[in-house]
UniProtKB/Swiss-Prot annotation:
Phosphorylation at His-356 by NDKB activates the intermediate conductance calcium-activated potassium channel activity, and conversely it's dephosphorylation by PHPT1 inhibits this activity. PANTHER family: SMALL CONDUCTANCE CALCIUM-ACTIVATED POTASSIUM CHANNEL (PTHR10153). Belongs to the potassium channel KCNN family. KCa3.1/KCNN4 subfamily. GO terms for cellular component: apical plasma membrane; basolateral plasma membrane; neuron projection; neuronal cell body; plasma membrane; ruffle membrane; vesicle. It is a multi-pass membrane protein. It comes from Rattus norvegicus. InterPro entries: CaM-bd_dom (IPR004178), CaM-bd_dom_sf (IPR036122), K_chnl_Ca-activ_SK (IPR015449), K_chnl_dom (IPR013099). This is Intermediate conductance calcium-activated potassium channel protein 4. Its main location: membrane. Pfam families: CaMBD, Ion_trans_2, SK_channel. Transmembrane helices S5 and S6 form the ion channel pore, which is surrounded bymembrane embedded helices S1 to S4. The S4-S5 linker, which contains two distinct helices, undergoes conformational changes upon calmodulin binding to open the channel pore.
Length: 425
């Protein structure tokens, strides 16, 4: 992976080419991981519904899983080799051993371990090659404990989804994103892409995430419950139990019977609470006013409060005059009635004035940055124009002063008497 040092425009071309290759490798790795998971699900369902009848086909499916796993491991190594080459290009290195750190080696080994876990392609000890069960009373016709754990561990390959989404999003390949991100010290990682899609397509992201979690956890729960030949192990029951647990309803008509099933339901409830919080945040943001709507609403409320203040002030003056009038006439009953109305009008006027003041403070605090930028730009242009005009006037004054100096010099030379000529003796 070493070689000559590439700088300048060649380094940019090399970086773009490496990112394109990483994108293709990550895409194919995700395809192979999905293929392996699909074959694993097919093997488990065939074993559940058909038992030992199709033992040769089950062995063939296991061999295909092993083959896809081998290709996946090769792609994982190739991807990290491209990562090392990209690091060497960015930092101007020649020796790949300098770019390969211990942390990266540990990450590569961990990924190889996670992606390499799969059911071993061996026939079940409970089945013969003829497709008959050796001990029909002891074997329930499903995966053993070790094989079930290896099968479920293949779901850990889904960690490749964020990597493929990051490379497919175009953020790393966009020069504008990289330039602005470098100026603002923003790292374009998986969380940035998740926030990006959460802001641009929140409905699609939450729907896909929710459906994916439902289907995955429902199948995992069915596998866990089938180990004990429980009635909850049917996929239809788990497809009902998982959404009810996800939505934190819990009718109690279907319950898990195994320890692993209870753990899956607990994790499903926690994920449901998190997704519900995200959904509430998205809905609250969608129900908020945008800038134009907020300005219109504040403007109309300002007019409404100003009108109420005028009406309250007019009512206060009216009741004060009526109170003064009935006090002069010695009508104590009417005077007390109008005094109560006057105090109520004073209270209403103070309340409306307080609301109007709060609205003004809220409007003043909502300073639009773009508007402020435009105001500053206009102010800068005005100052520049004034400065240029002042410089022109100063230049004009300087020219007039030079001309006046020349005129004064000429006038003084004309008024100076001629020097007497000395005659030769």
């Amino acid at each position: 992976m070493g070689g000559e040092l590439v700088t300048g425009l060649g380094a940019l071309r090399r970086r773009k080419r490496l990112l394109e290759q990483e994108k293709r490798v990550a895409g194919w790795a995700l395809v192979l991981a999905g293929t392996g998971i699909g074959l694993m699900v097919l093997h488990a369902e065939m074993l559940w519904f058909l038992g030992c009848k199709w033992v040769l086909y089950l062995l063939l499916v296991k061999c295909l899983i092993t083959l896809s796993t081998a290709f996946l491991l090769c792609l994982i190594v190739v991807f990290h080799a491209k990562e090392v080459q990209l690091f060497m290009t960015d930092n101007g290195l020649r020796d790949w051993r300098v770019a390969l750190t211990r942390r990266q080696v540990a990450q590569i080994l961990l990924e190889l371990l996670v992606c390499g876990v799969h059911p071993v392609p061996l026939r079940s000890p409970h089945c013969t090659l003829a497709g008959e069960a050796t001990d029909s009373q002891a074997w329930p016709g499903f995966l053993g404990e070790g094989e079930a754990l290896l099968s479920l561990a293949m779901l850990l390959r889904l960690y490749l989804v964020p990597r493929a989404v990051l490379l497919r999003s175009g953020v790393l390949l966009n020069a504008s994103y990289r330039s602005i991100g470098a100026l603002n010290q923003v790292r374009f990682r998986h969380w940035f892409v998740a926030k990006l899609y959460m802001n641009t397509h929140p409905g699609r992201l939450l729907l896909g995430l929710t459906l994916g979690l439902w289907l995955t956890t429902a199948w995992v729960l069915s596998v866990a419950e089938r180990q004990a030949v429980n009635a909850t192990g049917h996929l239809t029951d788990t497809l009902w139990l998982i959404p009810i647990t996800f939505l934190t309803i819990g009718y109690g008509d279907v319950v898990p019977g195994t320890l692993w099933g209870k753990i899956v339901c607990l994790c499903t409830g926690v994920m449901g609470v998190c997704c519900t919080a995200l959904l509430v945040a998205v809905v609250a943001r969608k129900l908020e006013f945008n800038k134009a709507e907020k300005h219109v609403h504040n403007f109309m409320m300002d007019i409404h409060y100003a009108k109420e203040m005028k009406e309250s002030a007019a009512r206060l003056l009216q009741e004060a005059w009526m109170y003064y009038k009935h006090t002069r006439r010695k009508d104590s009953r009417a005077a007390r009635r109008h005094q109560r109305k006057m105090l109520a009008a004073i209270h209403t006027f103070r309340q409306v004035r307080l609301k109007h003041r709060k609205l003004r403070e809220q409007v003043n605090s909502m300073v639009d940055i773009s508007k402020m930028h435009m105001i500053l730009c206009d102010l800068q242009l005005g100052l520049s124009a004034s400065h240029l005009a002042l410089e022109k006037r100063i230049d004009g004054l300087a020219g007039k002063l030079d001309a006046l100096t020349e005129l004064l010099s000429t006038a003084l030379q004309q008024q100076q008497p001629p020097e007497p000529i000395q005659e030769a003796t």
